[in-house]
Design a protein with these regions (language model features):
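Hydrophobic secretory-pathway targeting helix
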Residues: 1-41
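C-terminal capping alpha-helices of c-type cytochrome domains
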Residues: 15, 20-23, 107-133, 209-270
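Detector for the c-type heme attachment site
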Residues: 20-22, 55, 61-67, 76, ...
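Extracytoplasmic low-complexity, Pro/Thr/Ser/Ala/Gly-rich segments
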Residues: 28-73, 78-84, 92
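Intrinsic disorder/low-complexity detector
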Residues: 32, 38, 42-45, 113, ...
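Intrinsically disordered, low-complexity Ser/Thr- and acidic-rich flexible linkers and loops
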Residues: 34-37, 166-178
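Sequence/structural segment immediately N-terminal to covalent heme-attachment motifs in c-type
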Residues: 44-63, 140-165, 171-172
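Extracytoplasmic electron-transfer domains, predominantly the class I c-type cytochrome c fold
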Residues: 76-126, 171-232
Length: 274
């Protein structure tokens, strides 16, 4: 039996050796380059560096010409431009680890210089029609005006305290297209990202151009969203800043609890009398 198996084992060994010879040294498996954006080339000029980063990390989904593929949208139409490109990279929404994955905010995978390089390359190479990166100065924004703009245009989706939440029904798209969409809060977004989102309308968010929200109002709005991150709580404990319903419920529970304890104390005292 052993003699019968010997030629077979020798044949298998020779086949494996031949595969190793033709294949060369076998190293550990590595994911595709577009899943490793942090290891970008940094020695080239801004536009050239942006081209290298784009072709390596973005072209797989958006195409080398920026016209999009079945995995990613066209970058030469709509509000695509410097502001939107900077927004999705600054907030970590791009690049996604898997193309079908829904964009969500996370830590950016690129350094500031790399983001600027990609933005510059996309702008020069594809000439998208979207707006430029807005210039803002939250320190000089009018909080009162910002609160009015926020209440009129933002509070319906992002809540009065800026905590976001689930989008139930979009006024134009209906429930079928908005189910499962979560509106982000402002806690993890800087002022520039908020301004860029206002001007470009990423995802299900509407676009607010200069006619709807002027540059002065935009400056006031981002000043107010920055204030919402750490507002002054004149009434005491914020209770999560989720609104008056929860505050009222807590008030009722605490009030009724104190009242029940008082009634019990009175009843105990009355029972002790001779």
């Amino acid at each position: 039996m052993r003699r019968a198996l010997a030629p077979l084992l020798l044949g298998v060994g020779a086949s494996v050796a031949a595969c190793g010879y033709f294949q060369g040294d076998v190293g550990p498996y590595r994911t595709p380059a577009y899943y490793e954006p942090a290891q970008a080339a940094t020695g080239a000029g801004p536009v050239d560096q942006g081209r290298q980063l784009y072709l390596r990390d973005c072209a797989h989904c958006h195409g080398a010409d920026g016209k999009g593929t079945e995995r990613g949208p066209d970058l030469t139409v709509g509000t695509n431009g410097p502001a939107l490109t900077d927004f999705v990279l600054r907030t970590g929404r791009m690049p996604v680890e898997e193309p079908p994955e829904q964009m969500r905010a996370r830590e950016p995978v690129y350094a500031e210089g790399q983001i600027a390089a990609i933005v510059e390359y996309v702008k020069n190479e594809f000439q998208p029609p979207g707006p430029e990166i807005p210039h803002i100065d939250p320190g000089h924004g009018d909080l009162a005006e910002g609160q009015q703009v926020y209440a009129e245009h933002c509070a319906a989706c992002h809540a009065t305290t800026g905590i976001g939440g689930a989008l139930l029904v979009h006024p134009r798209q209906g429930e079928s297209k908005t189910r499962g969409i979560v509106i982000p809060d402002f806690e993890h977004s800087d002022a520039l990202a908020v301004a860029e989102a206002v001007r470009t309308g990423p995802g299900s968010m509407p676009v607010f151009g200069p006619r709807a929200i002027s540059d002065e109002q935009l400056n006031a709005l981002v000043a107010y969203t920055e204030y919402l991150k750490d507002p002054v709580d004149e009434g005491g404990a914020p209770i999560g800043r989720v609104g008056p319903v929860v505050e009222g419920a807590v008030g009722w529970l605490v009030g009724l609890g104190v009242l029940m304890l008082f009634i019990r104390w009175v009843g105990t005292k009355a029972g002790e009398q001779p």
